[in-house]
Amino acid sequence: MFIGFVQDRMEDIMTQSEKALKLHEEWNGKITTTPKCEVKSREDLAIAYTPGVAEPCKVIAANKEEAYRYTIKSNTVAVVSDGSAVLGLGNIGAEAAMPVMEGKAVLFKEFGGVNAFPICLDTQDTEEIIKTVVNIAPAFGGINLEDISAPRCFEIETRLKELLDIPVFHDDQHGTAIVVLSGIINALKVVNKEKEDCKVIVNGAGSAGIAITKLLLRYGFKDVTLCDKSGILSKNSKDLNWMQKEMMEVTNLTGKTGTLADALKGADIFVGVSAPGIVSEDMVKSMNKDAILFAMANPVPEIMPDAAKKAGAKVVGTGRSDFPNQVNNVVAFPGIFKGALEGHAKQITEEMKLAAALAIAGLVDEKDLNEDNIMPEAFDPRVADVVSQAVKANIK
């Protein structure tokens, strides 16, 4: 059944791929620059450019904060990538990353009303990336880091947050973590379990898996174990990077070892940001009753929803729009930046992330919650405003 699905899915992907390639050629890029002001006369020209433009320049020179009043800075984000970890394509470089970053800019505008520009850097050197972003930051109200490989992404984000006084947000980490937590909050209501009592397995110890684990712990989960392709991660695991070593101080506190199958025995929640088809029905059967599974590998999840349900799972989410419970970052990052920009936040804090997750979860009315309805729709017009208000309420 799984093999048949994969074959059907690959045929669908081929059809989508052909259409996407054709349309991208027709569009010749997905975004454009549209002026807000008209330049139809000499007077228009004199105000929009010289000599009139000198006046706001002088005001900003006297106080840099006035750039928020007189320029696009107040509602503009840089979408920065080095092309080192793009979707499932891997390290494809700056030019090849452009269609993804353009797409991200489209989503910022369509879902959050935020202007965004793709900035694809022809370097994968940590120091060069940091220096470049610092140097271009005056033009932007926020920095969205995208598709930068781990563990470099952790250092790049951390140092940029220290160096800049505008929000810096690695969406592959935190956007994913926020939507996962929001889904789990609602899934727990469906299965009538408490976070403190749940055993959680996160499979995939890269940027997304680590950020998910951190946010789950901050929310109040006590028993979280990280796994990767080698199995359960513990303090004795070999070849851990520096961030994974840090995570061993707060996860798998009993020092358990073994395979993913071993980890899932008696687990209540599985979150997969890993590889297709690696969770079997037998593994799901070994989990606790009414298990929650978020199988988010794309385009083929760790286990298909129907197989997971057949094996006893109660709530199943994926990253895809053709199954119930799509766990998609688009319900998070536009509203998060909208709120951060409108509130002139200097950083996006852990409190803001938790508030965003709770706000997203709250968009599904409790009377409408069920095993196939735990997430708001990406096209729900309330999402960005509700998330932005939650973020603004937590700016200090």
Predicted features and spans:
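Glycine-rich phosphate/diphosphate-binding loop of Rossmann-like nucleotide-binding domains
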Residues: I92-K109, I178-V271
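N-terminal ligand-binding/catalytic initiation module
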Residues: E11-I166, S388, N394
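General beta-strand structural signal in soluble alpha/beta enzymes
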Residues: P118, N144-D147, V168-D171, V202, ...
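Short, Lys/Arg-enriched N-terminal segments with co-localized hydrophobic residues
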Residues: M1-I13
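Adenosine-phosphate binding glycine-rich loop
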Residues: D171, A295-K396
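Rossmann-like adenosine-cofactor binding region
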Residues: K245-K314, R320-D322
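Short glycine/serine/threonine-rich phosphate/pyrophosphate-binding segments
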Residues: L87-L89, C153, T176-L181, N203-K214, ...
